[in-house]
């Protein structure tokens, strides 16, 4: 007799960055602890783009064509110090970083960390304690450069894997695999307007992604249409999340003083979309710290492949080829 599959509960949380990075990490921890006690409890939570470290909306850093200001450089100092150090190398150590094979890396709690600032270990601890697979956007510093990044934190064995964007390595587009409640999930992320890059999207579809993550800072009404298109193209579940906050929540260094304005700087707009493009939850507007949760059946991805598989039967790979430097885009095992 066929059994009904147990639903996988997916969630997006549009929390906003707080005044300091330790405060933001603590807020993430509290949100996950609270969610773990919920009914239903999410199996996976996605937090927004640059949630840890902050998205510097409205900041010009004193820059115009041909000129920089001392005040702008001071802004950058503040922003740089809010970024986190995950212990990777500037060129990206890949699997060596994941497996803790770099000099100074070791298993253990934050007090024994000799590489990085302990953020990786804090996130792994939260995942272990709550049993929730955590995916969050963050701003990472490596050497003298900042990167907009996504980190995946699996609750099993404290493992984590990180995806760097911007000037990161093309090999970091590799999808991540995990099992939740016995269900095989292949997940990958594209940050903000990277989702407008058709070849990048196709590199993820080619890896047979069934959970597509899109942390963003785009609050335009057109964003939902893009997320529905991605879900239909990839025949995958799509989670998109954006921060929601008012001007008074922005850091003082951004404008020189703390604003008292109650106007929204970012209205959110987080959503969850099915493999056939149906909006399951959202978009969630003007709800600071709001969270959406929905139970899904990943067999819906297979049901969608009956008539469309853009990286398979529809791809015409006899005529078109996509190669990504340093990346194997075949589905991960």
Residue spans for each PLM region:
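CN hydrolase (nitrilase-like) catalytic-core segments centered on the catalytic cysteine
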Residues: 121-134, 195-292
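A short, polar/charged loop-to-alpha-helix boundary motif
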Residues: 155-169, 288-308
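N-terminal glycine-/serine-/threonine-rich phosphate-binding loop
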Residues: 2-44
């Amino acid at each position: 007799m066929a059994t009904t599959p147990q639903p996988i509960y997916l969630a997006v949380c549009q929390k906003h960055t707080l005044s300091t990075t330790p405060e933001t990490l603590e807020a993430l921890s509290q949100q996950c602890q609270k969610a773990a006690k919920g009914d239903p409890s999410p199996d996976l939570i996605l937090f927004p783009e640059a949630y840890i470290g902050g998205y510097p909306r409205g900041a010009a850093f004193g820059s115009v064509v041909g000129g920089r200001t001392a005040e702008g450089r001071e802004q950058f100092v503040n922003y740089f110090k809010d970024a986190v150090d995950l212990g990777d190398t500037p060129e990206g150590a890949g699997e060596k970083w994941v497996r803790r094979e770099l000099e100074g890396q070791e298993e253990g709690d934050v007090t024994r960390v000799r590489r990085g600032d302990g953020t990786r270990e804090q996130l792994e601890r939260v995942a272990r304690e709550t049993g929730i697979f955590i995916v969050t956007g963050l701003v990472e510093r490596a050497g003298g450069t900042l990167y907009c990044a996504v980190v995946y934190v699996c609750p099993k064995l404290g493992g984590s894997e990180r995806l760097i964007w911007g000037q990161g390595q093309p090999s970091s587009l590799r999808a991540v695999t995990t099992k939740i409640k016995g269900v095989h999930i292949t997940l990958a992320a594209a940050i903000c307007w990277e989702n407008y890059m058709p070849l990048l999207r196709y590199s993820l579809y080619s890896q047979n992604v069934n959970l597509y993550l899109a942390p963003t800072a785009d609050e335009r009404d057109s964003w939902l249409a893009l997320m529905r298109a991605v879900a239909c193209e990839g025949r995958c579940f799509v989670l998109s999340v954006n921060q929601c906050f008012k001007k008074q929540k922005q850091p003082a260094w951004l404008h020189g003083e703390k604003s008292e304005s109650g106007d929204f700087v970012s209205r959110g707009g987080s959503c969850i979309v099915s493999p056939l493009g149906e909006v399951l939850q959202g978009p969630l507007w003007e709800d600071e710290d709001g969270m959406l949760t929905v139970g899904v059946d990943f067999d819906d991805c297979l049901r969608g492949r009956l008539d469309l598989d853009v990286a398979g039967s529809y791809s015409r790979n006899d005529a078109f080829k996509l190669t990504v430097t340093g990346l194997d885009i075949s589905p991960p095992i």
